[in-house]
């Protein structure tokens, strides 16, 4: 026993040192494992957060593009009403049917229920029904149009239908392409600003948390005490003076300072600028297209025969010549932008047409955000990449309408045996009368102006929406890359 005690006493220092070393090693390993796990956990959270942010940005981008399509569907009825003022094709068709009916009555050829099935031609008998209420022009315009068409001869009515149908579909092609481009730019600019603000706020919050974690418990406790003392009611400034009145400047700031409302009004004003294109901007190329259509089709008689390739070639020539006005003239840049956005001195006029008085008051007090958004849009519109996308949209529009017109012509090209006065198909293959092309073009415009927001069945808008170049441009704007 004494020997064991003496052995312990002799090696006491070794035992102490060994115990300390073992404890130190154990503590070091434990701390290392703890911090390693903590670091790995933070890295996992960081990667998960980054992946979540990327997915959120991607989802928001996809949703923004879908919103642009919804916006186009909502604006189609407006476009229908605007174009109906100068291109009311339905009234011309009704007048032609009236002429046909008068001719039948004068010959005494109508009997029984034949009235329902009468048509001016195989194309007219296969026409789509009259448009819905949303697509009709105002009653006063209808009355004027009917009075004008009723005094014209059958040949004049056919000539009007031919020129107006072709002019309308080309104007509609350019207007829809421009509107699709403008809507994509506007919504992606707004979406980018939104997610950048969110990212900045998130980064600032993380930076504050990081700085807070660097302090010791004592400093954190002292800062917490300081924060509590600063949040006491005495800190809140009383706008009242010593006599109980409220200072005028303070009252003005308190009543008008509403950043969220101001931001909302500015964004709505920015989106409402599309009114310019639908009501004023399109007039700049309307006269050009009308003149080109007259040059190509003025001398064509409704009974003249033309192949599908010949008709397509004439339409293509009009598109090419119009594109030169947009893209190859010295003043093309100014013309292009002036079609989409109003001049600065006309912005107030446009906003007065689209916003309510309360919103206008807010906008007059603070329109800085609107100016920034318009400036960004102008910068995007001046980019060569934007012009390339517009050319792609117009090119896709041309191919789409020609495919639709060809389908319409083929579906209406079966002649009726008793309809010798209105036979529109030539004996030679793939040759049709101009009258049939006019009817087919009119029906194509009705298809292009479909506004079924619930059914989303406008194939024309769907094709434009799916153009890859448009998605690439949207991605550049959304991600804040240079164009």
Curated annotation (Swiss-Prot):
Q: Which GO terms describe its biological process?
A: protein import into peroxisome membrane
Task: Indicate how the chain sits in the lipid bilayer.
Answer: Single-pass membrane protein
Please list the residue ranges that the record places on the Cytoplasmic side of the membrane. Answer: 36-483
Membrane-spanning parts: 15-35
Q: One GO CC term of this entry?
A: peroxisomal membrane
**Any one GO MF annotation of this record:** protein-macromolecule adaptor activity
Q: Which residues lie on this side of the membrane: Peroxisomal?
A: 1-14
Which UniProt keywords are present, listed alphabetically? Membrane, Peroxisome, Peroxisome biogenesis, Transmembrane, Transmembrane helix
Kindly report the protein's main subcellular placement as a broad class.
membrane
- Keyword Transmembrane helix assigned to the entry: answer is yes
UniProt biased composition (Polar residues): 242-253
* Keyword Cell cycle in annotation: no
Protein's cellular compartments = Peroxisome membrane
**Region (Disordered), start-end ranges:** 119-149, 230-253
The job of this chain, per UniProt, is described as: Involved in peroxisome biosynthesis.
Query: What family is it from?
Result: Belongs to the peroxin-3 family.
Q: PANTHER family under this entry? A: PEROXISOMAL BIOGENESIS FACTOR 3
Q: What is this protein called?
A: Peroxisomal biogenesis factor 3
Q: What is the originating organism of this protein?
A: Kluyveromyces lactis (strain ATCC 8585 / CBS 2359 / DSM 70799 / NBRC 1267 / NRRL Y-1140 / WM37) (Yeast)
Q: What is the lineage of its organism?
A: Eukaryota, Fungi, Dikarya, Ascomycota, Saccharomycotina
Corresponding gene? Answer: PEX3
């Amino acid at each position: 026993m004494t020997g064991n005690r003496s052995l312990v006493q002799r090696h006491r220092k070794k035992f102490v040192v060994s115990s300390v070393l073992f404890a130190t090693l154990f503590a070091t390993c434990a701390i290392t494992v703890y911090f390693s796990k903590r670091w790995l956990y933070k890295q996992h959270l960081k990667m998960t957060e980054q992946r979540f942010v990327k997915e959120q940005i991607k989802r928001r981008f996809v949703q923004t593009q879908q919103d642009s399509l919804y916006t186009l569907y909502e604006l189609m009825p407006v476009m229908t009403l605007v174009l109906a003022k100068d291109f009311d094709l339905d009234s011309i068709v009704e007048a032609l049917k009236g002429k046909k009916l008068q001719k039948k009555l004068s010959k005494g050829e109508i009997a029984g229920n034949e009235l329902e099935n009468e048509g001016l031609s195989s194309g007219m008998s296969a026409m789509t029904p009259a448009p819905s209420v949303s697509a009709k022009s105002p009653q006063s315009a209808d009355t004027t149009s009917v009075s004008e068409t009723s005094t014209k001869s059958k040949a004049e009515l056919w000539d009007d239908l031919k020129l107006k149908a072709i002019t309308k579909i080309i104007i509609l092609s350019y207007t829809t392409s421009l509107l699709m481009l403008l809507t994509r730019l506007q919504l992606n600019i707004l979406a980018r600003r939104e997610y950048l603000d969110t990212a900045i706020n998130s980064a600032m919050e993380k930076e504050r948390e990081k700085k807070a974690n660097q302090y010791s418990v004592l400093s954190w406790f002292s800062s917490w005490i300081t924060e509590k003392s600063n949040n006491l009611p005495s800190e809140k400034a009383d706008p009242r003076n010593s006599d109980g009145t409220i200072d005028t400047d303070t009252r003005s700031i308190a009543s008008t300072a509403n950043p969220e409302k101001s931001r909302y009004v500015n964004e709505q004003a920015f989106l409402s600028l599309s009114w310019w294109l639908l009501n004023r901007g399109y007039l700049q190329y309307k006269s050009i297209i009308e003149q080109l259509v007259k040059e190509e089709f003025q001398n064509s008689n409704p009974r003249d025969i033309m192949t599908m390739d010949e008709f397509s070639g004439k339409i293509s020539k009009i598109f090419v010549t119009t594109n030169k006005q947009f893209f190859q003239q010295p003043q093309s840049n100014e013309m292009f932008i002036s079609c989409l956005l109003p001049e600065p001195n006309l912005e107030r006029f446009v906003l007065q047409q689209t916003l309510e008085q309360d919103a206008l008051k807010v906008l007059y007090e603070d329109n800085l955000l609107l100016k920034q958004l318009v400036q960004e849009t102008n910068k995007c519109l001046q980019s060569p990449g934007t012009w390339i996308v517009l050319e792609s949209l117009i090119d896709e529009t041309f191919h789409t309408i020609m495919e639709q017109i060809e389908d319409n012509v083929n579906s209406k090209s079966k002649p009726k045996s008793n309809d010798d006065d209105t036979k529109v198909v030539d004996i030679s293959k793939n040759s049709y009368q101009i009258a049939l092309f006019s009817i087919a073009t009119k029906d194509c415009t009705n298809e292009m102006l479909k506004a079924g927001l619930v059914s989303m069945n406008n194939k024309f808008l769907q094709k434009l929406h799916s153009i890859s170049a448009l998605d690439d441009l949207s991605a550049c704007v959304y991600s804040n890359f240079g164009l």
